[in-house]
Amino acid sequence: WHDEINLPKTDLVVLPGGFSYGDYLRCGSMASKSKIMQSVTKFAESGGLVLGICNGFQILVESGLLPGVLLRNKYLEFICKNVHIKINKKENFYFKNIEKDIFEFHIAHNEGNYFCTEDQLKDIEDNNQIAIYYCDINGQTSDQFNPNGSIKNIAGVFNKKKNVLGMMPHPERMIDKSLSGEDGSLFFKNLIKNLK
């Protein structure tokens, strides 16, 4: 798989979580240089849909497809827990027609502290690129509900065209009531509906 250079015909590329290359150097750094990423970059630049979850988000940032960086968590500890997030439903494919604004997703990361320069932050705010915020159960953002120190409680961002989304929370871990919740299945069902 690490020698592949061409993407098959696809509607959506998903870069999942999973500590690629053992997270040596920086999370996502080595994976961002893998051969297939040239094709992923071309696909994204031509308007193709790319979703990065956790380590996938780190890879997208390291490859330059998304702005900013993901640093060590504020308290330098691995975080593994459920969090509430608020999504930005304005003008994007990923959350179009989704029924709710506030979700409960799982996080599991050591380097999920989103950071960007002041100029980058102004840019992503002006372009409505903040996709997901950490929040409380009512959608209020504050440092108290920011698990990792991310600037502005950012849990996910879009590129300028909004065809690329990176997010630290794991929707795939919340797809069944017996596995602590179904909010992730709402996300994926909506995504599939939007792809049709």
Segments predicted by a language model, with ranges:
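N-terminal beta1-alpha1 cap of cysteine-dependent amidohydrolase-like domains
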Residues: 1-53, 59-79, 86, 122-125, ...
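Conserved beta-strand and immediately adjacent loop positions that scaffold enzyme active sites
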Residues: 56, 84, 104
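Short, flexible active-site-adjacent loop segments at beta-strand->alpha-helix junctions, enriched
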Residues: 56-57, 91
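Central beta-strand plus flanking loop segment that forms part of the substrate or channel wall
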Residues: 78-81, 133-134
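Residue-level detector of beta-strand face positions
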Residues: 84-86, 156
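Catalytic beta-strand/loop cores that center a nucleophilic Ser/Cys/Thr
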Residues: 91-160
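Glycine-rich phosphate-binding loops of nucleotide-dependent enzymes
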Residues: 167-171
